[in-house]
UniProtKB/Swiss-Prot annotation:
Top enzyme class: transferase
Keyword annotations from UniProtKB, A to Z: Lipid metabolism, Melatonin biosynthesis, Methyltransferase, S-adenosyl-L-methionine, Transferase
Protein name: Acetylserotonin O-methyltransferase
Catalytic function, reaction form: N-acetylserotonin + S-adenosyl-L-methionine = melatonin + S-adenosyl-L-homocysteine + H(+)
InterPro entries linked: COMT-like, O_MeTrfase_dom, Plant_O-MeTrfase_dimerisation, SAM-dependent_MTases_sf, WH-like_DNA-bd_sf, WH_DNA-bd_sf
Reported function: Catalyzes the transfer of a methyl group onto N-acetylserotonin, producing melatonin (N-acetyl-5-methoxytryptamine).
Entry binding sites for substrate: 257, 303, 307
Gene: ASMT
Pathway(s) this gene product operates in, as recorded in its UniProt entry: Aromatic compound metabolism; melatonin biosynthesis; melatonin from serotonin: step 1/2
Length: 346
């Protein structure tokens, strides 16, 4: 970053300052249905047609489409009768609602929830606490009461998490051979995408999603196919209620929500419940040991500040938490993607 070129003209600083504009362009195009319309049409469409079908102004849509072209989310063909737009392949795969790898729901969660919390990042840094109260006018003392403040918000969050596991789930579940573990509890399993991937990869296992009652109800009714008999549900709060015996406990993006004290409390209960020879699989975005990256994880850790009571950690920090609970033979696997895997054995 400190090259002579950067010092003469701070291009990278300008890129950083425009970062939130880039995000909002993508979020807005998703929300308005630009990518879905172009996928469904099966052919490039003109500005006038896109604006008319999506009920927007021509002037506003033109600028949005051109920005998407600049970001390589759309491609444009200049014809005699004007500009015609189509999706790029990456948009077809990840930004349309109907794609199996769609990230639409997490985009909407970021746009409507995360984006608003980050407006108060300065306050979060000053105070060292999340910003639900400022962003939404609701108490943040009950973290998941705030996060699941309405059924619509809860569904948005759960569907968003499911979308992440549609592209990252296989990597974290195959980082280790989990076939010896036949009875698995997915603590805080939410919308069930990771559980579904687990029973697909390991057909001899059963997975029980352990989550709050209202989460379980939504997952049962709207997110997990009823014909999938290898997935069961357990309603409860794992900080207050008992954890049943099992061979393996999956905690995916759970510990990063909490401070070290709460993590030690939860892992101690998991260790008590775990069968001898069993284990716990942590799925988290790992910081490098010198905390110099990855930048995505550093940003996620700030997001934990504005939204939760937790933080992202290094592999050593997670290993120490597991060791304090009694787990041994801790192994770490970096996937090269957003989320990594840490396995501890009893």
């Amino acid at each position: 970053m400190d090259s002579t070129e950067d010092l003469d003209y701070p291009q990278i600083i300008f890129q950083y300052s425009n970062g939130f504009l880039v995000s909002k362009v993508m979020f807005t195009a998703c929300e308005l249905g630009v990518f879905d319309l172009l996928l469904q049409s099966g052919r490039p469409l003109s500005l006038d047609v896109i604006a008319a079908r999506l009920g927007t102004s021509i002037m506003g849509m033109e600028r949005l489409l051109d920005a998407c072209v600049g970001l390589k989310l759309l491609a444009v063909e200049l014809r005699r009768e004007g500009a015609f737009y189509r999706n790029t392949e990456i948009s077809n795969i990840y930004l349309t609602k109907s794609s199996p790898k769609s990230q639409y729901h997490i985009m909407m969660y970021y746009s409507n929830t995360v984006y608003l919390c980050w407006h108060y990042l300065t306050d979060a840094v000053r105070e060292g606490r999340n910003q639900y109260e400022r962003a939404f006018g609701i108490s943040s003392k009950d973290l998941f009461g705030a996060r699941y403040r309405s059924e619509e918000e809860m569904l948005k969050f759960l569907a968003g998490q499911n979308s992440i596991w549609s592209i990252c789930g296989r990597d974290v579940l195959t980082a280790f051979d989990l076939s010896p573990f036949t009875q698995i509890y997915d603590l805080g399993g939410g919308g069930g995408a990771l559980a579904q991937e687990c029973v697909f990869l390991y057909p001899n296992c059963t997975v029980t999603i352990y989550d709050l009652p209202k989460v379980v109800q939504v997952a049962k009714e709207r997110l997990v196919p009823p014909e999938e008999r290898r997935i069961a549900f357990h309603e409860g709060d794992f900080f207050k209620d008992s954890i049943p015996e099992a061979d393996l406990y999956i905690l995916s993006k759970i510990l990063h929500d909490w401070d070290d004290k709460k993590c030690r409390q939860l892992l101690a209960e998991v260790y008590k419940a775990c069968r001898p020879g069993g284990g716990v699989l942590l799925v988290e975005s790992l910081l490098s040991e010198d905390r110099s990256g990855p930048v995505e994880t550093q940003l996620y850790s700030l997001n934990m500040l504005v939204q939760t009571e937790g933080k992202e950690r290094t592999a050593v920090e997670y290993s120490e938490l597991l060791g304090a609970a009694g787990f041994r033979e801790v192994q770490v696997r970096r996937t090269g993607k957003l989320y990594d895997a840490v396995l501890g054995r009893k």
